[in-house]
Amino acid sequence: MEGIELGIQDLDRSYQIDTQAASSGDEEDRQEVPERPTKRKRTKEEKERRRSEKRARKEKRRSETAQAAQIQAPQAQVGIEAEVAEAPADYDEVEQVVEDAPVSEDNKKRKEKKHKKDKNKGKKGGSEEQEEEDREAIAASAVATLAQALVSSESDQVAPPVDQIQTPARPTTATSTSATWRTNPNQYGSTKVKKVPLELSPPPAASSLTPAPPATQLIPVTPLTAASAGASSFAVRDKINSLKHPKSSTNAPKAIRSTRKGEDTKESDAQLRLRFKDPKAQEEWLASTSIGKTELLRLEKEGILSYKKGKFTEDEKVSIKKALENYQKIHRMSSFDLVELVMTKTLQATDKETVREFWKDIAASVPGRPILNVQPFVRRMLDPKAHKGRWTSEEDELLLRAYAQHPREWTKISSIVDRTEVDCRDRYLKELVNRDTRTAGRWTKEEEDKLEEVVDRVAKGLRAEQVHGEERETPEEGTELVEPSDVPWDIVSKEMGNTRSMTQCRIKYRDAIWPRKLGLGKDDHVGRTLKVLTRLKNLNYESEKHISWSQVRETLEKYSLKEIRNSYSNLKKSVTSDPHVASLTYPELIKVMYDKAVMQRGRKVRADQRDYPSKETVESGDEAY
């Protein structure tokens, strides 16, 4: 101890420090600091007294609000009292709305911070009083708004629309937390935003709050039709309900929905009928709506829309090619990327919206064609596996082995055979199935009769399914004819015992049985050829590729498509044997063929006149109709 004391004395002498004086000074500083008073808890009597004071202030505010409303509308004072006496629940409803008013997450966090700071400073009681006064101010404003609406309705004044009724805002105080934004550079050179809270100021007294504005300032009156008292009260009540449940869609207009499927379909069809009165609107809808084949056929059958069918014309092919080229240039795509986009299925694409917009642009280039028909045509046009010509026996064997390994998985089968999915499916189902039991060559009379009987039976079954068991008015209604395009030829082939393929059955029925059922007798080939050439000459196609045989047949319904095409092909073959004629353009070739058909028809008429004399003479091909 003596050594320690000597060391302290040496320090005092070396650094001239008075350790005793310093220690005594610290003791004096500690004595000067006053002790922090502790927070005193309120007694039950004090709490009860504060509650009674709050209730008294609330009653006083209500009375002041009622007096203010009476001063603003003295003429309707009796009406207001009667309305309030009849429906006193409106004031309770306003209080409930104020109590249940939704508070955002930011307001909740701000309120929690304020409570914590008030608690630390011993001002929790003051913040509760402030919050209670805020709610009272909102309630007073809402009551004034309701009273003004009732006054306007009772005095036959113009009632304002509900949308123009302003919601009283929650009064703000100086105790609310405000903030400033600061930007500081971080280590990467960018700026980082920080939110720094400001210091809280003490809450003001209750008397310093800004009083609620009168109800006349909250309701702008506009020149509308006069509303009844009941309508005004209901409008204000709906406004209060919308404030109470802001996210509810009860008061918002809803689209009419039907619980029953039939009514919903009729409503949709009615809207489509109205829209499709404009042909351009129908074309835009077909080019922008992805719709299934069944629904498309239903809409066409019910007469809601019509669309183009059959093969794509040469003009449509050119339009599609131009649309593809423009899309490729605009999006700066390579040919490989364009083909990949075309072959990508929408449901399997990573960016489905891009694929949908692409097909909308392409379908818009061929008005009247639905996307359902445009997609397979464009894919076949750009698919590297397409346009490979006739199937070889080696490809048929490879297709059979691939199908045995992957039944009905046409994507895998297509990659193995190196043909398109559609080609593989059609080749297998139409040609290779039951190939061992199939008959080739000419049809016998028994086969034709059996085919006609099978088609009639299948068509009758289809009609029975369509009417869903409904009774027919007359027995003749079940004997109407069925178009060859509406017959399920896969079922017909099975009913034939798989002795003929789907393609064989379809072609035989279309070219031989169907014209006979329509009562179309066979005409001389010379007259038929002249009629076909006359029709082609009048249509004035640019080239042979532009010919639409279904359009040619519109005025030649007496003949089948095969007969029309054969008449053109046979005459063309006879005239193009001359090298000079073979080098002519299509319009020049049609003129040569027409002249030859007229010459043949005149020769035939003169021969008939020698055999069967008649007073009538046909002089030109135009009179052959």
Curated annotation (Swiss-Prot):
Residues 110-124 have a biased composition (Basic residues). The keyword DNA-binding applies. One of its GO terms (molecular function) is DNA-binding transcription factor activity. Residues 89-98 have a biased composition (Acidic residues). Keywords: DNA-binding, Nucleus, Transcription, Transcription regulation. Residues 1-139, 151-192, 240-269, 603-625 are annotated as: Disordered. Disulfide bonds: none annotated. SMART domains: SANT. This is DNA-binding protein LIV4. It comes from Cryptococcus neoformans var. grubii serotype A (strain H99 / ATCC 208821 / CBS 10515 / FGSC 9487) (Filobasidiella neoformans var. grubii).
